[in-house]
């Protein structure tokens, strides 16, 4: 459970992704204690800690908590009357409410903004099924390769041998069998990934719970390894044969990692089947099973962190993380020795998102899963190119937006002073890092962090304005649905300039369309620029269909590629 693929891959990338793995066993233990009519403290505090820890995984834990309680009830009790079910439902409801109330001090302030985000309210496309290649590689990926959509199973081969033994047992372990089938159905249907991901995009980040089931199955089945009948051994052998054939039948699944996983699975299964025939000492089987368990863990780690997979390149080298967070941009701002409260903006400085949290500054960059929908709506109105509402770097170098956001300093690299927006004339701070010099220029007319308006603009009038008019209007009046303030007399000085298009490298114009024929294509727009002005390029109605990597390669070239090259491309 601890060394499944989720830990090896996901928990290393995001350490808090291991939190649900900590709380799940405790919650399940608490459920068992309640069914045994023992004190509910383990359940209440485990649920409360899970809620305090992370709302995202708390949602998933809640679903699996309910599923486990249902399966466990039908496994333990013969009385399945509505009255008895209702009694236990009430008991768990009371204890769950107590736990949520304990966690509410942190859970509510975090979860309430989530419901207002566009990310939560977005209508995500959920296909009925995954692509064919997902199903072709599915069986092998349980103990081999990583699946798509965060389906990082990576279970040891010996644990799957335990599953074979489980299904060889007739009229036993019904709840475990049903749970195993159910979670596999969840992995096979995109809609399950949609629901378990908070009704957002399809993602199988719940797969750590599947790892708990696999581990629990093996622990329950372990004593059975020493008492298999001949009939049961035959069933296990047939299941092994069917699994290996189906897992390796598709050509796309025949990767080195999957093949090695099948070898380990076969060896561990044959070891279990050999007990009682080739060797009879229980200690020998115990040592060999432990050996295959360790070998499976090391095998998964080796492939995940291999040079070919190059997973380690996504991380910062040991001892360099703090150095990366202490960016030259923040150092330049801090060198101003300005004690007031202000924000800074930057352009093309390669600064790290959220470095301000480490450095004690206030920037216009942001990267966190929970983002205010009001900010996202404002960015949409201003045509700010931020593909993710929860991830943005700057305010596009626009003077007006910087003023509205109380930006006092703008940072650029030395030699890139041409990137400075209007108004930043005085050099106030300077810092050097890694051979590069960062310059912080001050805006003498910066607005304070808090400011007021003396007139208002109706939302109806504001919505009719163009984007350039909107940002000018916000400097003159506040947008409200109604107010007793005087109405703003807006004044605009923007204008459109004439231009013509010229075909560039890798594209051509045809019937009102831009036809792109190669990567990094260029279309030239030729115009006379205005002096002492910001120039905006606004594109509207520019729609296109995505192109898959396969469509970029001719059939002739595709046929000459190896399976490995094709899989790597896809």
Model-derived segments and spans:
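Membrane-embedded helix bundles of polyisoprenyl
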Residues: 1-76, 88-111, 116, 186-187, ...
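Aromatic- and carboxylate-enriched substrate-binding clefts and catalytic-loop regions
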Residues: 19, 58-68, 120, 126-130, ...
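Contiguous transmembrane helix-bundle modules in multi-pass membrane proteins
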Residues: 38, 57, 175-191, 197-324
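Membrane-interfacial, low-structure loops and terminal tails that flank and connect transmembrane helices
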Residues: 76-89, 229-235
């Amino acid at each position: 459970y601890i060394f499944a693929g989720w830990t090896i891959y996901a928990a290393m990338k995001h350490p808090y992704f291991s939190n649900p793995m900590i709380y799940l066993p405790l919650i399940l233990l608490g459920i068992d204690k309640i069914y045994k009519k023992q004190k509910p403290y383990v359940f209440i505090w485990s649920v409360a800690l899970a809620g305090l820890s992370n709302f995202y995984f708390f949602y998933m834990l809640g679903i699996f908590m309910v599923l486990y309680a249902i399966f466990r009830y039908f496994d333990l009790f013969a009385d399945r009357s509505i009255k008895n079910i209702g009694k236990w439902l009430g008991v768990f409801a009371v204890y769950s409410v107590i736990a949520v109330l304990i966690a509410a001090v942190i859970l509510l302030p975090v979860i309430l903004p989530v419901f207002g985000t566009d990310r939560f309210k977005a209508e995500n496309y959920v296909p009925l099924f995954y692509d064919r290649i997902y199903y072709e590689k599915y069986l092998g990926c349980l103990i081999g390769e990583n699946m798509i959509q965060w389906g990082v199973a990576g279970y040891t081969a010996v644990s799957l041998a335990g599953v074979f033994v489980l299904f060889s047992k007739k009229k036993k372990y019904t709840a475990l069998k049903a749970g195993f089938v159910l979670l596999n159905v969840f992995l096979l249907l995109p809609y399950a990934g949609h629901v378990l991901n908070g009704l957002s995009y399809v993602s199988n980040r719940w797969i750590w719970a599947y790892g708990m089931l696999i581990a629990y199955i093996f622990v329950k089945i372990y004593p059975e390894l020493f008492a298999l009948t001949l009939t049961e051994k035959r069933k296990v052998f047939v299941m092994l044969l069917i699994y290996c054939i189906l897992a390796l039948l598709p050509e796309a699944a025949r990767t080195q990692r999957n093949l090695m996983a099948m070898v380990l699975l076969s060896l561990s299964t044959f070891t279990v089947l050999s007990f009682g025939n080739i060797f009879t000492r229980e200690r020998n089987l115990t040592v060999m099973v432990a050996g295959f368990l360790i070998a499976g863990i090391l095998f998964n780690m080796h492939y995940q962190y291999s040079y070919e997979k190059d997973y380690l390149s996504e991380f910062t080298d040991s001892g360099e993380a703090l150095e990366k967070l202490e960016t030259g941009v923040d150092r330049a701002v801090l060198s101003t020795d300005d004690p007031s409260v202000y924000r800074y903006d930057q352009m093309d400085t390669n600064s790290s998102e959220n470095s301000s949290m480490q450095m004690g500054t206030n920037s216009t960059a942001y990267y966190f899963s929970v983002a205010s929908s009001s900010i996202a709506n404002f960015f949409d109105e201003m045509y700010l190119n931020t593909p993710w509402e929860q991830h943005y770097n700057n305010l596009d170098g626009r003077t007006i937006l910087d003023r509205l956001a109380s930006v006092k300093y703008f940072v650029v690299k030395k030699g890139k002073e041409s990137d400075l927006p209007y108004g930043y004339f005085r050099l106030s701070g300077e810092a050097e890092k890694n051979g590069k010099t960062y310059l912080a220029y001050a805006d003498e007319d910066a607005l304070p962090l808090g400011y007021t308006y003396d007139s208002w603009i109706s939302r109806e009038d504001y919505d009719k304005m163009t984007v350039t008019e909107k940002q000018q209007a916000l400097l003159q009046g506040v947008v409200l649905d109604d107010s007793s303030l005087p109405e703003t007399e807006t004044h605009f000085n923007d204008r459109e300039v004439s231009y013509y298009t010229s075909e560039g490298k890798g594209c051509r114009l045809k019937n009102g369309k831009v036809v792109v024929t190669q990567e990094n294509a260029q279309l030239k727009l030729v115009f006379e620029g205005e002096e002492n002005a910001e120039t905006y390029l606004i594109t509207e109605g520019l729609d296109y269909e995505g192109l898959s990597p396969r469509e970029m390669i001719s059939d002739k070239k595709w046929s000459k590629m190896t399976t490995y090259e094709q899989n790597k491309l896809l």
